[in-house]
Amino acid sequence: MERAPGSERRSPPGPGVPRPPPRGHAPSTAAPAPNPAPLSSSMQPDEERQPRISESGQFSDGFEDRGLLESSTRLKPHEAQNYRKKALWVSWLSIIVTLALAVAAFTVSVMRYSASAFGFAFDAILDVLSSAIVLWRYSNAAAVHSAHREYIACVILGVIFLLSSICIVVKAIHDLSTRLLPEVDDFLFSVSILSGILCSVLAVLKFMLGKVLTSRALITDGFNSLVGGVMGFSILLSAEVFKHNAAVWYLDGSIGVLIGLTIFAYGVKLLIDMVPRVRQTRHYEMFE
């Protein structure tokens, strides 16, 4: 049976045969898709550079948030333990030296009515206590990089600074109000020179170790030793000035007030900085 013309069944075009465009429309040529490789490669350096900038700006804060100091990335384990032992030796040396100087300075303060000598004696006691806190800080070998232990030591140092500064300022103001005149002799000179030199040397050692170990407690202990050295030389300065000009009797007490206020300001700054960090790192205790 023959089929009528036009009634043939048309098979759909195969996948390889393109469908002709409708009448009245020009054939559209598809534009080739852009290659995303150059774009991604051009953006990759910027994306890599941005994390590096942010990481460099918040490097130490990131490690402290995890309970570690920045020294954990700077020092190898054996290097950290070596510097920890050096910090312990310097702290023991500081305790012995400053304790002897404190006894001598208290003797000078009582015998010669020197407010600066009293202030130095109090600062020497503070140095003994701060060095003892540093001993506790580095007594545990496993806690050499512990941020929480570091901040606790700094908070204790801040409280001691406040108490000592109050005692120094009160004693100096009392001496100024009663017009106490310091006496000058060879013993006063010997104590002031010896204390100034020894405390300055201890301060340099503590600053160096504190920088390597990134320890705020060691740096604070070094600041305290530096104040002790300045007070030792101030005893010599005020005594020499009073020897040549008795009208400047207030220099000794004024130096005592100035040093006491300096210690007070440092203690307040230390507490403001460290108390929030103790709370932040209390869940990351790295010591037993």
Swiss-Prot record:
The chain crosses the membrane at residues 88-108, 116-136, 150-170, 187-207, 217-237, 255-275. Residues 1-64 are annotated as: Disordered. Residues 109-115, 171-186, 238-254 are extracellular. The lineage of its organism: Eukaryota, Metazoa, Chordata, Craniata, Vertebrata. It is found in: Cytoplasmic vesicle, Secretory vesicle, Synaptic vesicle membrane; Early endosome membrane; Late endosome membrane; Lysosome membrane. Disulfide bonds: none annotated. GO terms for cellular component: early endosome membrane; intracellular vesicle; late endosome membrane; lysosomal membrane; plasma membrane; synaptic vesicle membrane. Strongly expressed in brain. Also detected in lung, liver, kidney and spleen. Mainly expressed in the glutaminergic neuron subpopulations. Residues 12-24 have a biased composition (Pro residues). Keywords: Cell membrane, Cytoplasmic vesicle, Endosome, Lysosome, Membrane, Phosphoprotein, Synapse, Transmembrane, Transmembrane helix, Transport, Zinc. Belongs to the TMEM163 family. SUPFAM superfamilies: Cation efflux protein transmembrane domain-like. Homodimer. Interacts with MCOLN1. Interacts with SLC30A1, SLC30A2, SLC30A3 and SLC30A4. Zinc ion transporter that mediates zinc efflux and plays a crucial role in intracellular zinc homeostasis. Binds the divalent cations Zn(2+), Ni(2+), and to a minor extent Cu(2+). Is a functional modulator of P2X purinoceptors, including P2RX1, P2RX3, P2RX4 and P2RX7. Plays a role in central nervous system development and is required for myelination, and survival and proliferation of oligodendrocytes. Residues 41-71 are annotated as: Required for interaction with MCOLN1. The modification Phosphoserine is found at S11, S54, S56, S60. It is a multi-pass membrane protein. It comes from Rattus norvegicus (Rat). Residues 1-11 have a biased composition (Basic and acidic residues). GO terms for molecular function: zinc ion binding. This is Transmembrane protein 163. The keyword Iron does not apply. It catalyses: Zn(2+)(in) = Zn(2+)(out). Residues 1-87, 137-149, 208-216, 276-288 are cytoplasmic. It comes from the Eukaryota. GO terms for biological process: myelination; zinc export across plasma membrane; zinc ion import into synaptic vesicle. Residues 25-42 have a biased composition (Low complexity).
